[in-house]
Amino acid sequence: MKILLINGSPKGKRSNSLKLAYSFIEGFKNGCTDDEESISIDELHVASMNIAACKGCFACWQKTPGICCIKDDMQTVIEKLIDADLILWSFPLYYFNVPGILKNLIDRQLPMSLPFMSSKQDGYGSGSHDSRYDMDGKKHVLISTCGFYSADGNYDSVLRMFDHFLGKGNYTTIFCGQGELFRVKELSARTDEYLSTVKCAGSEYAMTGTISEKTDTILHTLLYPRDVFEKMADASWGISKTTGEKEPDDLVFTRQMASLYNKDSYDGKERVLEIHFTDLRHTYQIQLSKTGSEVFTDGRL
């Protein structure tokens, strides 16, 4: 079993999505019936590779069939794509599609197609080109995180693109919202729980070629409720929503801490927490109420 992991994050090995991909691979190895020695894993970190944009010259179809005129790392990528049994596409969602560096890699797969027009076999789209190589039997898994509270409804263009060049229904997805939380060590109890579910998904995929409905449902569960996450996310920028001015780090920390308040625990009594940063001589108040939490900087409470 040859696994090819394509990390399309501009952050390289610091990618949040890559953490999910590694968990999936760990689970896959545990669930695979093959000896671990027979499983090879090849990683391509696109951010550190030299892959230029396609020129649209179509030399790879006419002048040098199957060979791109651009001499860079893409030829190696194509060789590995042809050789792999399972391909993991790991990437973040920044602006409703894959990052530009990964899109370059996808576009540069043009030499892998024949130039002659063909009909789509899955009824998706209005035309196609047959593959130059035998790609039947290859498995694909898309693993991605995004910065919205939920992945739902934000990957439409990603799905349509992969439907076109992989074929509709020919790949599995793990899309997770609130992706930036995977780098916050203080929230690791929750994110590690999610990574364990991704690991379970990898084991199931190795054994059955799919992810169970039960596990998929858990993967679609929000890391934190929408209101909690969006408060944390807004505070993380360190910029005032009203003035646009930069806020001190201790205030950012206080706002993020306050956002974790669970309003369902309200017992009928409002409470005020006052925090003194003695080294900075800053004082903040957090009001905990039936409707949620609010941070005050003027000592009014």
Show which residues each predicted segment covers.
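A short acidic, helix-capping loop that chelates divalent metal ions and anchors anionic groups
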Residues: L181-K185
